[in-house]
């Protein structure tokens, strides 16, 4: 991942001049966005005993970002992600008979990102993005019967609930105006494999 970040930064540096002339229309310096992503990665450390495996209901990631454009091509910013999940343990997972426990897990992520706007036209924007940061997760266990079943519990130490977080988006598409646009992006990380959302650009001072 570190090599990927380095290569990405070098590409951004050398592409800034090449792509700057394409961005004579869309040049908001401050941008905010909110989105929803499917199948975000997780580093949740809950592992059951050898006989019991959970069924997982992945709600998806909800995230918000702020980006400050340093040039008409390169921007940096921060991203916050919230990822709730539900794990259900049964004696027979296939038929969902014999409930053992219900576990609600959630993670909070803060990442700093680099965004490269490859193409900017009046109504279309193409970009790539990479981010790194930290994730903090926690859980809430319900209906657990420890006298009947044994499940390995996560560590209660806060330091053990902190993990590395990342997001890599090779391609993202924004469609709309300079001020408001919808977006869809494909990648891997805390924002999900496929994400959709809304981007709003603050009007620059004259």
Regions found by a protein language model. Give the residues of each.
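Predominantly the C-terminal beta-signal and adjacent terminal strand-loop region
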Residues: 83-87, 157-206
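Short glycine/proline- and aromatic-enriched beta-strand/turn motifs that initiate or cap beta-hairpins
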Residues: 20-68, 199, 203
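Sec-dependent N-terminal signal peptides
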Residues: 4-14, 20
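Residues that define the transmembrane beta-barrel architecture of outer-membrane proteins
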Residues: 28-30, 56-62, 104-110, 124, ...
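Outer-membrane beta-barrel channels and translocator barrels
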Residues: 27, 39, 71-73, 119-123, ...
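Transmembrane beta-barrel strands of outer-membrane/channel proteins
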Residues: 32-40, 78-82, 128-134, 173, ...
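Extracellular loop and loop/strand-boundary signature of outer-membrane beta-barrel proteins
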Residues: 48-52, 95-102, 154-159, 181-183
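Gram-negative (and chloroplast) outer-membrane scaffold detector with strong preference
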Residues: 38, 60-145
